[in-house]
Each structure stands twice: as structure tokens, then as C-alpha cells.
């Protein structure tokens, strides 16, 4: 198990523009040839946007982009004609495929926090696609078949335990609270990268929320 602490993430964003970002993998100007991906996962970015802040229209291609809103509301508009407001507990997926442009903003009067994760598709190209799942339940894994991956959202009370899925590559990101994963204790913003995961259990040290990626061989 490879544990990465919250303070090891690369800082990003633009504080003057109301954007604070933390990147778990190489991203933008922060290049680390030894930290480009884990399994299909290319990025795990925690984004905090002040009211009125956001990312102007920008392009993506050949990427599966999955977003989970922690608090606040994320306004999304893209060149394929989708316009939605993504709220806390919602999962959003944008398949960039051969190419798409989008805007992401906090048009609400309260701060916005979301975790955005990028995955490499098994086959490049195709047509862009968009989906949103409102208030996804813990018992409902979210499949990203183009990347051979499955997202599990886990919300734990203190002392509660949950099985971590087995997989060739399993990535556990702690959104908030504290958990014990095997022999490791993880806090908010920490992550664990597990190769060949088998029989792992996560236990809430406090009330906690986790995002767990189950991925196959790449």
C-alpha cells in the first residue's frame, strides 16, 4: 500500500481568482515523471471555488472526467449542449472522447468544493457523452466502462467498517474525516494506492467519506 498524504499534493489554481486546487498526480505545471497515473487514474483534484469563481471554457479529449461535489453547487456547460447544476452528493461524468469544451463555475452565493478525477479510456476517440447521477447511494457503484473502472462512494460513521473492493488497482481518497485502512490511518485529503488489493477493510476513526476507485489491469 502506497499512502500519499494531503500535504504531499501539488498546489494549483489561482487564489486571487478564488480558486484553490490540490493535485494528487502530475498536473499542469507540476510535472513528476514518477507520478503520472495509477491504473487508469490520471488525476484526482480537489477544487475549492469561491462564489463567482470558475474555470472558463477549455478543451478536453480522450479523457473520462468524473466529478463528485462535496459541498455547494457546480454549474456545468459544454459544447455538446449540456447545461446542469451539480449538487452535493451528485456524481457527474463527461466523456471527452474525440474532443469537447466546457465551463465549470460556482454561480452560487456559497463556497464550492468538489473532487474531479480523470481516467484514461481503453480506446481513444468516439463521441462525447454526459451523465449525472443525483445523490448517489453508498450501495450503488458507478461504472465507467470506457476506462474499465468503478467508483464506490462510502460514507462511514465512527467505528463503522466497510469492505474495500478487490482489484488490480484500487485507489482510496479520503474526502473528509479519518479512517483506518488496513494498518494505515488516513485523514482528510490523504489517499492510498493499492496494487492487487484483496480483503481490505476501511474503518471510520471519525465520521468520514471516501471515494474508492476499483480498476482493472491497464
Regions found by a protein language model. Give the residues of each.
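Ligand-binding loop in jelly-roll beta-barrel domains
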Residues: 81, 96-127, 195-218
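Short histidine-centered beta-strand/loop micro-motifs
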Residues: 53-60, 77-78, 103-106, 161-166, ...
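Short beta-strand segments
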Residues: 44-45, 69, 95, 118, ...
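A short, N-terminal "cap"/entry segment at the start of jelly-roll beta-barrel domains
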Residues: 1-51, 55-56, 83-88, 101, ...
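Glycine- and acidic-residue-biased ligand/ion/polar-headgroup-sensing regions
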Residues: 61-80, 88-91, 166-182, 188
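Short acidic-glycine-tyrosine-enriched beta hairpin
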Residues: 80-95, 135-137, 161, 180-204
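Strongly charged, low-complexity linkers/loops
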Residues: 141-168
Amino acid at each position: 500500500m502506497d499512502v500519499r498524504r494531503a500535504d504531499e499534493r501539488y498546489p494549483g489554481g489561482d487564489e486571487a481568482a478564488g480558486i484553490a486546487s490540490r493535485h494528487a498526480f502530475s498536473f499542469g505545471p507540476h510535472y513528476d515523471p514518477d507520478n503520472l497515473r495509477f491504473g487508469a487514474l490520471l488525476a484526482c483534484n480537489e477544487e475549492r471555488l469561491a462564489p463567482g469563481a470558475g474555470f472558463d471554457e477549455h478543451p478536453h479529449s480522450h479523457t473520462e472526467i468524473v466529478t463528485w461535489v462535496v459541498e455547494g453547487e457546480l454549474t456545468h456547460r459544454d459544447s455538446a449542449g449540456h447545461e446542469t447544476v451539480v449538487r452535493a452528493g451528485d456524481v457527474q461524468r463527461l466523456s471527452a472522447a474525440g474532443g469537447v469544451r466546457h465551463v465549470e463555475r460556482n454561480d452560487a452565493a456559497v463556497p464550492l468544493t468538489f473532487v474531479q478525477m480523470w481516467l484514461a479510456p481503453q480506446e481513444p476517440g468516439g463521441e462525447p457523452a454526459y451523465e449525472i447521477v443525483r445523490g448517489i447511494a453508498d450501495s450503488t457503484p458507478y461504472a465507467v466502462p470506457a476506462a474499465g473502472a468503478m467508483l464506490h462512494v462510502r460514507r462511514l460513521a465512527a467505528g463503522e467498517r466497510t469492505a474495500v473492493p478487490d482489484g488490480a488497482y484500487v485507489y482510496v481518497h479520503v474526502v473528509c474525516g479519518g479512517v483506518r485502512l488496513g494498518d494505515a490511518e488516513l485523514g482528510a485529503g490523504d489517499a492510498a494506492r493499492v496494487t492487487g488489493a484483496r480483503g481490505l477493510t476501511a474503518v471510520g476513526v471519525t465520521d468520514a467519506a471516501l471515494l474508492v476507485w476499483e480498476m482493472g489491469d491497464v
